[in-house]
Structure formats: structure tokens, C-alpha cells
């Protein structure tokens, strides 16, 4: 999907680590079609990644984020685009929450 590529590219531009997308369409869920996940070692970098994802989605896909959470504390930022939910973690929070393990049946693609 084009928008997933825009998001992963925006993450990689800001040196995000562990970038992956999870295709949830074949799972019996109504949450969204895709998760796009990454992590960074600092809150400053988490914020920079989130800002770049939002900017690139506006520029290249003409899409505004519908809802966002976590920008204040920068431990785990969630950007909700309805069909795509973006998760940007600080490294230790990604290890703790392990979203990939919770959604292990999803088809996962790694980008770095």
C-alpha cells in the first residue's frame, strides 16, 4: 500500500529502528488494516519521527492524522489514520509492550 511506504520512508528518513508493517486485513479485527511500528532511543527522536510521518503524509498522500496520542511524554506515540495506525516507541517501551507478539498472525514486513 502506497501510504504504508510513505510512512516507513518517513520513519527511515529520521533513522528509526526496527521499522515494520503488519498487515491485519486477514485477521478478524476491526481496529485497522495496518500497523506500522518503529522505535528510537530518545524522546526527541520519537517526536522527530512522528512529526516527519505527519508531514510526509500531508505532502505525499494529502492525509491528516485523525487522532494522535503520546506526544507529550514521547514514550509511545500513536498516529491514527483510520486504516493505518502508526506506533512509534522509545526502545524500552517497544520491548515491554511487544505488539508484534500480540499480533503474531499478521503478515509482517521489515524495512531495516
Task: State each model region's role.
Residues 1-31, 39-77, 91-94, 99-112:
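Polybasic/polar functional segments that serve as interface/processing modules
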Residues 79-81:
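Active-site beta-strand termini and strand-to-loop segments that position acidic
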Amino acid at each position: 500500500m502506497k501510504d504504508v511506504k510513505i510512512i516507513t520512508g518517513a520513519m527511515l528518513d529520521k533513522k528509526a529502528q526496527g521499522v515494520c508493517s503488519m498487515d491485519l486485513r486477514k485477521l478478524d479485527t476491526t481496529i485497522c488494516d495496518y500497523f506500522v511500528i518503529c522505535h528510537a532511543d530518545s524522546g526527541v527522536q520519537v517526536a522527530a519521527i512522528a512529526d516527519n510521518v505527519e508531514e510526509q503524509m500531508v505532502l505525499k498522500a494529502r492525509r491528516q492524522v485523525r487522532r494522535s496520542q503520546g506526544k507529550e511524554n514521547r514514550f509511545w506515540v500513536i498516529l491514527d489514520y483510520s486504516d493505518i495506525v502508526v506506533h512509534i516507541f522509545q526502545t524500552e517501551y517497544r520491548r515491554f509492550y511487544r505488539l508484534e507478539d500480540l499480533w503474531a498472525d499478521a503478515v509482517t514486513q521489515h524495512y531495516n
